[in-house]
Amino acid sequence: MMELVTPTIRQGGVNTVFVMPNLVPPVTTVDRALEYKQRLQAIEPNVNYLMSLYLHETVTPETIIDAKKRGITGVKSYPAGVTTNSSSGVIDYTQFYPVFAEMERQDMILNLHGEVPSTGDVTVLTAEERFLPTLLELHERFPKLRIILEHCTTAAAVEAVKKCGPTVAGTITAHHLSIIIDSWAGDPFCFCKPVAKTPADRDALLRAAASGNPKFFFGSDSAPHPAVSKRGGDKIAAGVFTQPHTTQLVIDAFEQACENGVLKEEDITPEIVEGFMSKFGRNFYGIGEEQKEFIIIDKKDEKIPNILKSDKVDVVPFRRDQQTWSVSWSA
């Protein structure tokens, strides 16, 4: 899988990625994270890979000190059992308070998959909103800790991020700017965690993305799965593969939102797009621009393929067979 999808990063207009640690087994040590980075660089050297650790009981304050010294960017938290390869995830955040305190001292980033497990009266539709008090509590206890609420899907999540101080931000994906409940209910290739919600929630995400507020920036959460695991069997895999056209899909979503009256065309300026897609995220992560690159987006005859294949695996991309924008790189 890695050999098939890593070359698609730059195809989607992206040159910097925060690499998720939810492999099997999860990436819980600095050595393993750096070994993973070397493998990625061997496939595509022209990408800046920001490596992370999986928040796990074996991660200690001493691990954080070592991680900072050796160039690890952050730690990713997955609630236990909520999404792909999260069985080793968090049940009780309080046990990690010493880790968070050290992350705050070391100025590392905590990336949150913001959902609670679907138990009792919690469903996939309410799991994100039920998590938001945890976000607020973590921010209150560790006000200098940089926290990212990843892949926001609700208006409530947008408001929670706004309520927090400047050390808290939220990412928004390309697919959540266009899909709603009905999309994934009828198409497994639109199913991901957290799931897309209502049209009102989608519109709140669009407005946040186009607001120019630096607390909101793009994060693809592109999650490739073998096509067979998306078509049925025991359980459909949660994840949407957007990377080969992820920048183009954001532009498509903005364009559609303008046609639907959710956004105004005059408000989607180059500065707004650059801020959401690049500048705000780079600033939050503290990434320099030693080799600044630009992408050129053009309305050519670009079509998203039906499937990506290798000798070992097939992956179906989001919006397969549909027309989109083309992307080229310029120094």
Provide a role label for each language-model segment:
Residues P214-F217, A223-G288:
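His/Asp/Glu-enriched, well-ordered alpha-helical/loop segment
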